[in-house]
Structures are given as structure tokens and as C-alpha cells.
Amino acid sequence: MKIAIDIPSQELDLLDDRGDIFRRYRISSAGNGTGQQNGSFCTPLGRHIIRAKIGAGQPVNTVFVRRRPTGEIYSSELGAAFPGRDWILTRILWLSGCEPGFNRLGAVDTMRRYIYIHGSPDSVEMGKPGSIGCIRMRNQDLLELFELVDAGTQVDIRA
């Protein structure tokens, strides 16, 4: 399996070993567009791998901060209480760049930028950029994807 993320269409394709689309999901990438620099709040481009899978066994809508469950379960009431919070929910696929000087090492290191594929509240619109760099997915879609991929799975992000 391999993941291909197309920024213009805001779609994530899970490809089988022949390169055929096995699953297609709507996503939300960065509101600032694409870019490699740390602090840009952009979605990085290029070849990546899934560095780590985080959150297996946690309930749907589990809230994560710094890749750790907080003990909170997201609800619309919690969202209203913290309207400016960037919600990372349910599962995390932590990405690592594979291209030194482009998306790996130094000020362009995807992993050190903490770029994830992660779940988000149901109120977040998919198909429209809006994150601060990560790839947001519907929780149910992410649960499915999480079970279909392994750490080390290739992820290509293109504009």
C-alpha cells in the first residue's frame, strides 16, 4: 500500500501494490497552502513515510496534545469552550520526510514540524484547506486508513 495526497483536489488516495486506487478520502490541508519551512504553517510536499502510528485502541474523538491522549473526548461543548484550539483527534499518522534538504533535516524537516494525518471534529469542512500544516481527515475515514497502513508506508504529497 501507498498513500498519495493531492492538494488541489483535497483528496487522499490509498493505492494498492499495482498503483490502483483502493480507497479515496476527502481531506483538509493547510490554509496557508504548501511549503516546507518550519513555522510556515504550510503542508509539506514530496516523498514521506509514516514514521509512527499513534492512538491504537483509543476511543473515537480522543483528544491528543503532543501525541498523547489528554483524557478528553471531543464534543461540541468542549469545542465551544476552546474555540481557538487546533483539535487533533482519534488517531495520528506522524509523517517523516524522505528528501534531505527538501522535507528532511534542518528547517524543512517534516517530522520535526510535527506534521500528521489526523482526525478532526465533524464540524471541520473537508475538501477545503484549513489546517495549520497537517492533513485533516474525518474520524471514521482515519480509523479505516489507520488499520490499512503500517509504519513505513510511503506517502507522496503533491500540488
Feature annotation, model-predicted:
Residues 24-26, 47, 114, 154:
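Well-ordered beta-strand positions in beta-sheet-rich domains
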Residues 60-159:
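Exported/periplasmic cell-wall-interacting domains
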Residues 35-53:
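Short, surface-exposed secondary-structure junctions/capping segments
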Residues 7-9, 22, 45, 88-90, ...:
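Extracytoplasmic
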Residues 35-36, 58-61:
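Short, solvent-exposed loop/turn elements at domain surfaces
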Residues 1-33:
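A structural motif detector for short, solvent-exposed N-terminal "entry" segments of globular domains
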Residues 4, 13, 49, 92-94, ...:
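Soluble periplasmic/extracytoplasmic beta-strand elements of cell-envelope proteins
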Residues 1, 26-40, 72-79:
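N-terminal post-signal-peptidase region of extra-cytosolic proteins
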